[in-house]
């Protein structure tokens, strides 16, 4: 029986991916480069180190990826400081509140950093529901490695078989599946690959669509 629900953050709870993409495009343009949607899709859900490898392969070995990341984060900071909004994905806040009312433990397993994770959850008014928050600051091996989910289960005192995962990215879903958890996928930018399609428990268009399956999800 499921006792804990673990959510990804970017692209699953919050509609941050489109903002990150705009910030990457601005940062790349400053360097005379074009950051394509295809390249961004390849970087979604993976670690900064792995993303840097892809970016360097795309632009060439001399491309200053560290500066690109620094400028991207600077643009993101500016967006927030100027009052830019971080919107929930459809049904996300309601899903967190629903599972909390059902008496389940709620946790976050994100590839983002702790500072941003706590900021978004706080601003969104849902941090109070979370019993555990695990980010890239807490693990050595990023998604698609299952470490972030295994660490989260340990924090919750739950067996992996008792955990229900919601993810949007291929890397994140692969991590949840590889951890041995019941993993549901709600794609935003990139559709699931064959591994995720074959091993995901459910695939939804939106978190608004999960309720008819609730008995099956929590069994």
Regions found by a protein language model. Name each.
Residues 1-42:
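Active-site neighborhood of HAD-like aspartate-dependent phosphohydrolases
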Residues 1-3, 97-100, 113-219:
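Asp-based, Mg2+/Mn2+-dependent phosphohydrolase catalytic module
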Residues 13, 88, 106-109, 141, ...:
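Conserved SAM-binding loop
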Residues 24, 28, 48-55, 69-80, ...:
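Hydrophobic alpha-helical core bundles mediating ligand binding, dimerization, or RNAP-core interactions
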Residues 27-59, 65:
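Alpha-helical substrate-recognition element adjacent to the catalytic core
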Residues 30-33, 59-63, 102, 125-129, ...:
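Short helix-capping segments at alpha-helix termini
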Residues 34, 56-97, 102:
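Metal-dependent phosphoesterase signature
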């Amino acid at each position: 029986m499921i006792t804990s629900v673990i959510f990804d953050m970017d692209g699953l709870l919050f509609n941050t991916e489109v903002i990150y993409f705009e910030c990457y495009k601005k940062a790349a343009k400053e360097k005379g480069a074009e950051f394509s949607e295809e390249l961004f899709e390849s970087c979604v859900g993976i670690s900064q180190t792995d993303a840097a490898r892809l970016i360097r392969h795309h632009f060439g070995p001399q491309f200053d990826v560290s500066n690109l990341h620094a400028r991207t984060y600077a643009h993101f900071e500016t967006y927030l400081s100027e009052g830019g909004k971080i919107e929930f994905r459809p049904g996300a806040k309601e899903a967190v509140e629903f599972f909390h009312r059902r008496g389940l433990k709620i946790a976050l397993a994100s590839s983002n950093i702790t500072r941003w994770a706590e900021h978004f959850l706080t601003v969104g008014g849902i941090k109070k529901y979370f019993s555990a928050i695990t980010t890239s600051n807490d693990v050595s091996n990023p998604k698609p490695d299952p470490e972030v989910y295994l660490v989260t289960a340990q924090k919750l005192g739950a067996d992996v078989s008792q955990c229900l995962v919601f993810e949007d990215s291929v890397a994140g879903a692969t991590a949840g599946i590889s951890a041995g958890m019941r993993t549901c996928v709600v794609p935003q930018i990139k559709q699931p690959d064959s591994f995720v399609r074959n091993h995901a428990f459910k695939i939804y268009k939106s978190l608004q669509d999960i309720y008819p399956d609730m008995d099956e999800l929590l069994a």
